[in-house]
């Protein structure tokens, strides 16, 4: 049989005793430090979780708005625009206010000759 060695570990705690108005308060500094670290840890984790949730919501909203924008101004609306432009409309021609301007006359003549 071999030698068995056992070790005992003693934990020493710093205990603070204070009295105020004839009341005794005993607190362990190790416990209070643990509580402070625990509160800081929980607050940090809470902030990280809140930021992650905000990031996910932002990404979802961004994807939704991008798809909506593509539908309104993208490929699907090009066919609608070409349909609207191919149909003749009686309200397309607007008479210019300044008819004596030669640039307006040339532009109107070039537009009328193209159609």
From Swiss-Prot:
It is found in: Host membrane. GO terms for cellular component: host cell membrane; membrane. Belongs to the rotavirus B NSP1-1 family. It is a single-pass membrane protein. Keywords: Host membrane, Membrane, Transmembrane, Transmembrane helix. Its main location: host cell. This is Non-structural protein 1, peptide 1. The chain crosses the membrane at residues 39-59. Signal peptide: none annotated.
């Amino acid at each position: 049989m071999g030698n068995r060695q056992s070790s005992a570990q003693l934990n020493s705690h710093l205990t603070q005793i204070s009295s105020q108005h004839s009341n005794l308060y005993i607190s362990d500094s190790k416990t209070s430090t643990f509580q402070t670290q625990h509160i800081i840890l929980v607050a940090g984790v809470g902030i990280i979780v809140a930021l992650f949730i905000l990031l996910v919501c932002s990404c979802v909203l961004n994807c939704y708005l991008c798809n909506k924008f593509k539908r309104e101004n993208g490929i699907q609306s090009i066919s609608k625009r070409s349909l609207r432009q191919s149909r003749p409309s009686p309200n397309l021609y607007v008479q210019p206010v300044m008819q004596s301007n030669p640039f307006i006359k040339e532009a109107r003549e070039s537009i009328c000759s193209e159609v």
